[in-house]
UniProtKB/Swiss-Prot annotation:
It is an enzyme of class 7 (translocase). It is found in: Cell inner membrane. The gene is nuoB. NDH-1 is composed of 14 different subunits. Subunits NuoB, C, D, E, F, and G constitute the peripheral sector of the complex. This is NADH-quinone oxidoreductase subunit B. Disulfide bonds: none annotated. The keyword GTP-binding does not apply. Keywords: 4Fe-4S, Cell inner membrane, Cell membrane, Iron, Iron-sulfur, Membrane, Metal-binding, NAD, Quinone, Translocase, Transport, Ubiquinone. [4Fe-4S] cluster binds at residues 36-37, 102, 132. It comes from Delftia acidovorans (strain DSM 14801 / SPH-1). Binds 1 [4Fe-4S] cluster. InterPro entries: NADH_UbQ_OxRdtase-like_20kDa, NADH_UQ_OxRdtase_20Kd_su. Its cofactor is [4Fe-4S] cluster.
Amino acid sequence: MIEGVMKEGFITTSYDSVVNWAKTGSLWPMTFGLACCAVEMMHAAAARYDIGRFGSEVFRASPRQSDLMIVAGTLCNKMAPAMRKVYDQMSEPRWVISMGSCANGGGYYHYSYSVVRGCDRIVPVDVYVPGCPPTAEALIYGIIQLQQKIRRTHTIARV
């Protein structure tokens, strides 16, 4: 992040680096727990793993207060429009983590008539966390991967 430090105590860096650093340390997730993966998501937020160390301290109930949606579980056809509506209500910039094989591709219920075969058919997904259910460590690794992806984005358009 820091390109140079002068003797007087000044730090020189780019605006993009500062803004992206701030974004990575203040992810406000909104839980979209649909099945058993949500239990592992709660486990990741508990005292043992404490995702607050990575800037995801408080799970928000309102989409207007969150910038990260964690989709955890099986998405059915009737729930898909509601999920899209919640995603559209989130403020920009917004990110999505697909957690578990059911959210990634339908999981065990892939061939069911009522299951969406991956939440990426409804909302754009930034990070996929595999597993059935994925462990809390896997979710934390997914959050770290998302933070690295955010650091690589450009806030200001280059001409």
